[in-house]
């Protein structure tokens, strides 16, 4: 059987804060105002043991402080500081901290090899459903974020959250929105297809998205999205990943100790996952948090460190 390749990112997630002004009905991550903010000493204490461990990506994943909150500047400075420490220790940051201003995106571009924001579903209808109390989930705000990332030339990850009350037509519309943005800017490296997976902290009583439904969305996405966009599926949220790979998915995302967004669903052990995939003819390989064809879009100051990681990854692939 010919072996095919599927990738993952050896990652560790840092959460600056779970405080978030959104109250999405399906969320198992957020906390109210007053939740702890990560302190500088904590960042170093968490990252230092990871040096030399094989972890490359530091995923900075944060709750959102409202743009008009007087603490917004302090919140954003904390995120910048976390990225700077990660770079200092030799890691490659990727930040997803919600909807940002153009200037905030420009600032993070200097400290991250890529950024991310889930488009989720490009439909205002859900503002009367699971996004009723989530002001930053207005689709126009999120598509603007993807547009700005393209204008700035930032390698970008986005995705759909599936099974949150959307229709099949809305899924297709969302994929076509992403495809149009990619046609304009060429900056989108991957699209995550994330099935809603109920957790113990959410307020919405929605059912999980079935594997058969997800399989159909993967096939549709591969038909609609440009070929250079990789389709990602989260291995801890699906039953058997192999049919999804056969349908066109080629990445399993960042795999680390804990899935902080879906804490009820443990990440698989990479070695066991690799064995399982190998039995089906797939080779599991690590990747960086920016895809090779977008390396040149990464900020000049980050190119030496990125080059070191790219060379190390290429060397490992031939030994």
Curated annotation (Swiss-Prot):
Enzyme class: lyase
Any GO MF annotation of the entry: 7,8-didemethyl-8-hydroxy-5-deazariboflavin synthase activity
Pathway stated in the Swiss-Prot or TrEMBL entry: Cofactor biosynthesis; coenzyme F0 biosynthesis
Domain of life: Bacteria
EC code: 4.3.1.32
Reaction(s) catalysed (UniProt annotation): 5-amino-5-(4-hydroxybenzyl)-6-(D-ribitylimino)-5,6-dihydrouracil + S-adenosyl-L-methionine = 7,8-didemethyl-8-hydroxy-5-deazariboflavin + 5'-deoxyadenosine + L-methionine + NH4(+) + H(+)
Cross-referenced SMART domains: Elp3
Domain spans labelled Radical SAM core: 6-236
Protein role: Catalyzes the radical-mediated synthesis of 7,8-didemethyl-8-hydroxy-5-deazariboflavin from 5-amino-5-(4-hydroxybenzyl)-6-(D-ribitylimino)-5,6-dihydrouracil.
Family the UniProt entry places it in: Belongs to the radical SAM superfamily. CofG family.
PANTHER family according to UniProt: 7,8-DIDEMETHYL-8-HYDROXY-5-DEAZARIBOFLAVIN SYNTHASE, FO SYNTHASE (COFH)
Record text on subunit structure and interactions: Consists of two subunits, CofG and CofH.
Protein name: 7,8-didemethyl-8-hydroxy-5-deazariboflavin synthase
